[in-house]
Regions:
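Short, charge/polar-rich alpha-helical segments
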Residues: 1-16
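Short, charge-rich amphipathic interface segments used for partner binding and complex assembly
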Residues: 10, 21, 28, 32-69
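Short amphipathic alpha-helical segments
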Residues: 16, 20-23
Length: 69
């Protein structure tokens, strides 16, 4: 069974890969509308990854896994 932390870490990786793929698609296209669409999608996936990363940090804090410098 997967822990919440593992699930969130997997989502961060997945969303980051989706954002990177959309960025590549945007760069590869000659059509300005297609570029804008893929760029917007990449931004959304990046925001999702950031939110999941924030959730991961909160889970670490709650579980006591975070060490503060």
């Amino acid at each position: 069974m997967m822990t919440a932390k593992e699930y969130v870490e997997g989502k961060v990786k997945s969303y980051t890969r989706l954002a990177e793929r959309c960025r590549r698609e945007a760069e590869a296209s000659d059509d300005i509308v297609v570029r804008a669409e893929y760029s917007a999608r990449a931004n959304v996936w990046e925001m999702c990854a950031e939110e999941m990363d924030n959730a991961r940090e909160m889970l670490q804090e709650e579980s006591g896994e975070v060490t503060y410098a």
